[in-house]
């Protein structure tokens, strides 16, 4: 029975402390309130039998609970009404009595005693039989069977008055009770009765669910879970004990120096853990740890309240139970047994304990381990205190001050070996950063192996294989190979003789013909690759070394412009001259200042230099002279003479005007300061731009290379105060990076920057020119505002790289949809597939500038650089460069800096330039000349003996082949049988720019067609070369085909014919030709399967059969045409295209075309 009493008292502790439960001996009931359990006594853990008895009692009580439930319900209903009248009378009396009492802290009492006045019940004693659900505690049923006699006046309640209810203690005690039960805090029994009556349906439903759960074996499952949990806790506690013993043993090995401070011999130091077990000693000799005096308590606190607060201060508690907060009521027999066990226990670990700092005895509260061993041990480190709301005596506060002082002095004595120093925390900027030691390669390898330990074997093997392959590739591959076995095979390196289908002259005859050439004909230069004949070495001795000289400064440039104005129809000659003169003056003055002061590459001009420069420019209107070291400046012509404002655009004005109208809706003032529009115009533009739709913020500029697309954007951005954010093909244009860099710019309307758009050194100089150069409008110019709106420019959007531009197209459409700033997309290919959606919305087409306007612009530019060039020469070079203005400007700058035409070159012979050397189209001032060798300078390189000086357009080759064959020096003269020789007739001029660029050679040529027949195979070969890479749409396509074509033609003519000077035709007649090969690639042209699967004969056959059927029927519209759905124009069903296809090849061979009734495949 001892074990049973022990277990039952443990569960009764939260609700009843002084009253004895039914079933316990009377001696326990008498001794429990008189002799309270000492908190310093170590209790033995419950035996295994007590756990089994506890499980059996829970099963029995669960069955008893169901039988008594109905009985208690009937009693509650009968006694509720009688108790209601008595409660109303007692309520008024209790209110008056409670007003006179002093507040006292809540202390731990029995469930019958909570809420009573002077230990007497306010309501009927029959009320005690009401069941109270207390977290499914098994002892709640014993409280219902108690007799009224047992509920008497307890000694504890009579000794002290009722304490004042503390809010926190009330909440902590109330959470142990179920909902609807407010036994401890209720003051009016009427409220309890009303609450119980209202909660009757809920209680019935809850009881019904509990019955169903018990029928299904819920109690057994709950007991099994609790047993399993207790077993796990027991195992964990045993493991913790073993680890604690191991730690204690390891700590005992460490030798610590004893403290020099005097210590009290009667007090032994505790273990290092703040939570140490203390037991009360019965004998001083067998004492393990001496008991310390209890904590000084407040006057209004009782032992139960103090013990409750000390246990609430524990930071770790059992999760599912609140029994750890209350002491376990034990019988005196158990206490005696535990005392004997504590006395007989030998001090096993006392000598090994490590002494730590000795603190005050009154600081650490004494906590008795009254919980069973299965409960987790609670740590007191950083515990919270719950007694702040209690009324404490002033004596305790006064004693706390010297305790802290003693403690501080004692800590200093113990730690005298390590003197305390005030730490100084410095900012990371002032802390010396020590270099990190290089990690050990073996450690890094071990870490890498640990991180890859979870990787599957298949992936690891693949990574190792890839790594080995990369290593092998790096070791074996050389960027620049040491030995190159691939070379260019010369034409004369073959062993066998060169097979030529026509007769050649002997070497003696060829040398005689070469010596017989006139003196004004062009010969090979000293640095050229010649045929190594004796005549070449003889003529090379007479060549003198030539040095290029600086061009002389022209004095009367305005006189040239006045003479040219009449010839330049509909071109602003004087406006162009004035703009270029201002730019030339400005940059020449800057270059002179830099050359004088020996300034660096930063192009910075000091204030003094700028002042003197402005004064000189204001006083002297003459042209500024550049320094001798850089007679034409240090900037490229493409940067030096590019337009800065909209009014400076002279060519290709229509697309620039359209782009300006698009940007004017985004600009604040509708344009620049000098070209600002009125408020009404700006308002109208904003309304128009708003009506463009959701995609009005994006514009696509499409045009060939060097047509002025990018230059127009930067010009208008500078004119309309925009800041350009450029993205070109040289950047890594992934979609993620593009969105991250431009998302902020697209969402913000303005960007504040002090710098100018374009931000380079040349751009800064151009801005200075913009402010100080144009004097006529200087008064109207206002300083530009610092607030610049952003503009996004995406260059080369039609060029995509698979590895570097992942997600670039999606990023463009995302920016176009979400951007609040204008987005301008520049493309060269109008048929780009991934930009078709943007091109269908807003697009501006740029065309190559007109040859006549560009030639006049370049003529004025060359005049400003003191090198006037013939207008026809500029047109020829511009057309030769496929209307590439950038390339023409670069070649023009190289030609001017090279000195223009040299005296020797003017007298020497060679392939004639397409100009008239006798008469020039441009008028000149007396004493100056016009340079006329610009075209020949780039079409006749020095390292080639003979070169065709016109673009190798193979449609023009048929026009010039007879003249080339007639001028051949190696072909023997032949005459056709019965035919005489005739001289070649001169061609008449049909060119809009100049007369036909041809002259009679005076040589005889045969009228026989054998000359063309000898080059038939050669014509086929160069036809294939002209079509190479026809399916590629990049900027190098034309140049590559041009070089290949030139190489084929020049080597063939030089090796097989050895042609000399001959006239040529640069402009072809406007003849309309149809060529299917222009739309096919190399693979199709050289593929036999493509030729055998040609579908055009089948289509022509279908068209002819449909035409014959329509002519034979009465109504031609009865049946639709077979190819009706495949017309060029979907909205029109005309058959004119099919009729045209029927007439193809009909006149040449009407019967040669077979009739085929094949149907086109889908």
Swiss-Prot record:
ATP binds at residues 703-710. Expressed at higher levels in the germline nurse cells than in the somatic follicle cells. It comes from the Eukaryota. GO terms for biological process: oogenesis. Residues 79-111 have a biased composition (Basic and acidic residues). Residues 125-136, 998-1008 have a biased composition (Polar residues). Residues 666-676, 684-697 have a biased composition (Low complexity). Coiled coil: none annotated. GO terms for molecular function: ATP binding; DNA binding; DNA clamp unloader activity. Residues 1-136, 144-163, 179-202, 249-319, 348-380, 611-634, 666-697, 900-923, 975-1008 are annotated as: Disordered. Disruption phenotype: RNAi-mediated knockdown in the ovaries, results in lower DNA content in the nurse cells and defective development of egg chambers. Simultaneous knockdown of elg1 and enok, results in relatively bigger and higher DNA content than single elg1 knockdown. Further, egg chambers in ~25% of the ovarioles are able to develop beyond stage 9 with morphologically normal nurse cells. It is found in: Nucleus. Component of a heteropentameric Elg1 RFC-like complex composed of one large subunit (elg1) and four small subunits (RfC4, RfC38, CG8142 and RfC3). As part of the complex, might interact with the Enok complex, composed of enok, Br140, Eaf6 and Ing5. Within the Enok complex, interacts directly with Br140. Belongs to the ELG1 family. Has an important role in DNA replication and in maintaining genome integrity during replication stress. Promotes PCNA deubiquitination. As component of the Elg1 RFC-like complex, regulates the functions of the DNA polymerase processivity factor PCNA by unloading it from DNA after replication during the S phase of the cell cycle. The PCNA-unloading might be regulated via interaction with the Enok acetyltransferase complex. Might have a role in restarting of stalled/regressed replication forks during replication stress. In the ovaries, has a role in nurse cell endoreplication. This is Enhanced level of genomic instability 1. It comes from Drosophila melanogaster (Fruit fly).
